[in-house]
Structures are given as structure tokens and as C-alpha cells.
Amino acid sequence: MDAKAQAAARPFEHTVIVRPTTFQAGCAIGTDKWVEFQSLYQLLVDDETQNRAICEEVVRAVRDGRSPLILTERNEHLDRFEGVLSASVPHVVVLRGGMGKKQRRTEAERLAAIPREEGRVILATGKYIGEGFDDPRLDTLFLTLPVSWRGTIAQ
């Protein structure tokens, strides 16, 4: 079943909200698109204005009773978000590639133990959260970096 058919079958509505920003890469595009894409990632990770705006939106979502997943591709970005969001959100759970089986199990248990009425946010890399991760409470997705192919979003 393709992503559109799956979305149509779900008992909830999908809404995409685009947040225009003032971000400007400020550099010329080179001939190696992969290198340029990685450079763009780093510029976005380092953009404090952009990151602050994302964190404000996440905190607002949690206060509105949402259970968001913040998705990035950079561990450094996860660390930055964790540092800011931990001051405002009671439960910040970070999931990233390279976590051992024991650590993954510990984080899964921690997630399961968070009461529904308590605010929480999951920060994760796409590589970790891809196939096989399921959390029925997730209802909001923040894509903090551009994606380079459609399959990333479909998952």
C-alpha cells in the first residue's frame, strides 16, 4: 500500500503547516549537490534564529496537548534541541542511531512510563526512527531539515 492510501485509511486528518523563515544560505551552489546538501544541513543546524523558532513551536505544541516528534539528521542538532527544550518540556526523549540494545530498551520503557497528561517530546534522527518505530501517542511531526528524497517522508 502506498503512503497516500495509508494516509486515507487512517482515522485522523493529516495537515501540513509550512512555516516560512528568513533563513538564507548565503553561499553559491556548487556542482556537487551532495556536498552542497550537507553544507546546507550544517548551516541550518548552526542557525540559532531558526532553531529558536522551531523550539518555540514545539513548546507551543506540547502546551496545546500535542505529542510531537522532532526529526533531524544530525546528532549535533538533537543535542541543541535537547538543551533548549529540556528547560520547558517535562520529558525530552532523545533517540539516535548508535544506541545500544540496552539503551534503546531503557528509552522505550521511559517513553511508555510517561503519563498521558504530562508533556513530552521525542527528538530523533531519521535513521533511528525509520522502519519499526511505533508510538501511538505521536500526533505532530516537525521536520527540522530538508529531506533529499520522498521515501524519507513516506516512512
Question: Can you describe what each PLM-predicted range is?
Answer:
Residues A8-R10, R60-R63, S86, A112-E117, ...:
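Conserved catalytic network of the ASCE P-loop NTPase/AAA+ motor domain
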Residues I29-E73, D79-V84:
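Conserved interdomain hinge at the start of the Helicase C-terminal
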